[in-house]
Amino acid sequence: MPIGVPKVPFRIPGEEDASWIDVYNRLYRDRLLFLGQDVDDEIANQLIGIMIYLNGENQSKDMYMYINSPGGAVLAGISVYDAMQFVVPDVHTICMGLAASMGSFILTGGEISKRLALPHARVMIHQPASSFYEGQAGECMIEAEEVLKLKDCVTKVYMQRTGKPMAVISEDMERDVFMSAKEAQAYGIVDLVATDDEPSTNTPFDYGRKW
């Protein structure tokens, strides 16, 4: 039987008794964000809202986004990426499990030098796909033009964030390209790979201990 989202005690400053809140809300208070599902408008709006709130609350403390996502909607992913660049604090990105498609796009949007992959994480890049399969020819042409614009946008971001030539990015995105954590580091999508003998990035609650 599913147990739902675990709850943990949290005491609001100034109050004597702790209340029970879900674990994600507790971690948000320590500027830890989670993308653990398909990228869609709902999760994108949640992440953007949290980042904007935390930005207004304290612009000197970094944020940490943990990613385990197969990807999803292109515009939703781009909106999260743009918000990460908009907020003043640095946003660390940490890949756990899989960061594919828009998941890898968001992963590479973390502050350069502060993008981390766990040792057995996987990363995948490919070009944006159209979801418009039926309709008038004119509508298909309009959508095809939009997909090409989105592909150009995504390719340019990967180029800027990885340092790879645009021709290399464009060629690699023509198909699904899977990478290990070390391969993603060599490609420039992440900067660090956590290992047993290296500390990861420092985060609240001693999340910076050795993995």
Swiss-Prot record:
Q: Name one GO cellular component term.
A: chloroplast stroma
- In which compartments does the protein localize? Plastid, Chloroplast stroma
**Top class in the EC scheme:** hydrolase
Any single GO BP term: protein quality control for misfolded or incompletely synthesized proteins
User: Coiled-coil regions in this chain?
Assistant: none
Q: Which key words are in the record? A: Chloroplast, Hydrolase, Plastid, Protease, Serine protease
Q: Which GO terms describe its molecular function?
A: ATP-dependent peptidase activity; ATPase binding; serine-type endopeptidase activity
Q: What Enzyme Commission number(s) does the record list for this chain?
A: 3.4.21.92
> InterPro entries of this UniProt entry?
ClpP, ClpP/crotonase-like_dom_sf, ClpP/TepA, ClpP_His_AS, ClpP_Ser_AS
Main location per UniProt?
Answer: plastid
Question: Where's the active site on this chain?
Answer: 101 (nucleophile), 126
Task: Identify one Pfam family in the record.
Answer: CLP_protease
| UniProt catalytic activity | Hydrolysis of proteins to small peptides in the presence of ATP and magnesium. alpha-casein is the usual test substrate. In the absence of ATP, only oligopeptides shorter than five residues are hydrolyzed (such as succinyl-Leu-Tyr-|-NHMec, and Leu-Tyr-Leu-|-Tyr-Trp, in which cleavage of the -Tyr-|-Leu- and -Tyr-|-Trp bonds also occurs)
Presence of the UniProt keyword S-adenosyl-L-methionine in the record: no
Q: Which residues form each disulfide bond in the chain? A: none
PANTHER family listed in its UniProt record: ATP-DEPENDENT CLP PROTEASE PROTEOLYTIC SUBUNIT, CHLOROPLASTIC ATP-DEPENDENT CLP PROTEASE PROTEOLYTIC SUBUNIT 1
Question: How the protein assembles, per its UniProt entry?
Answer: Component of the chloroplastic Clp protease core complex.
Describe its function: Cleaves peptides in various proteins in a process that requires ATP hydrolysis. Has a chymotrypsin-like activity. Plays a major role in the degradation of misfolded proteins.
Family to which the UniProt record says this protein belongs: Belongs to the peptidase S14 family.
What is the name attached to this protein's record? ATP-dependent Clp protease proteolytic subunit
